[in-house]
Design a protein with these regions (language model features):
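Domain-level signature for proteins that mediate thiol-based redox and metal-cofactor handling
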Residues: 1-97
Length: 97
């Protein structure tokens, strides 16, 4: 099973942001991920790795990932045919604003 690691800057107080993203991933993919690890760091780091592949780096990608895009990326790696419900709908479809 895949592993996700979220490296965050503890000096920047990004623990809550990284814990929220971990919670979102675990809530959606509880049976599909072996773990979501939180790794404290320094120097403004905020990086998300999926099985050793860097999928988001704050400095490289500019800012923080949208949780919708993060979940869709993980879904596409784990189970591309899986419906994420409202996350897969675009504005104007039934059930969306």
């Amino acid at each position: 099973m895949p592993r996700v690691a979220i490296t965050y800057c503890r000096q920047c107080n990004w623990l809550l942001r990284s814990a929220w993203m971990a919670q979102e991933l675990l809530s959606t993919f509880s049976d599909d991920l072996s773990e979501v690890a939180l790794i404290p760091s320094t120097g403004g780091a905020f990086r998300i790795d999926f099985d050793g592949e860097i999928i988001w780096d704050r400095k490289r990608d500019g800012g923080f990932p949208d949780v919708k895009a993060l979940k869709q990326f993980v879904r596409d790696r784990i189970d591309p045919g899986r419906d994420l419900g409202h996350l897969d709908r675009t504005s104007g479809e039934p059930g969306t604003p």
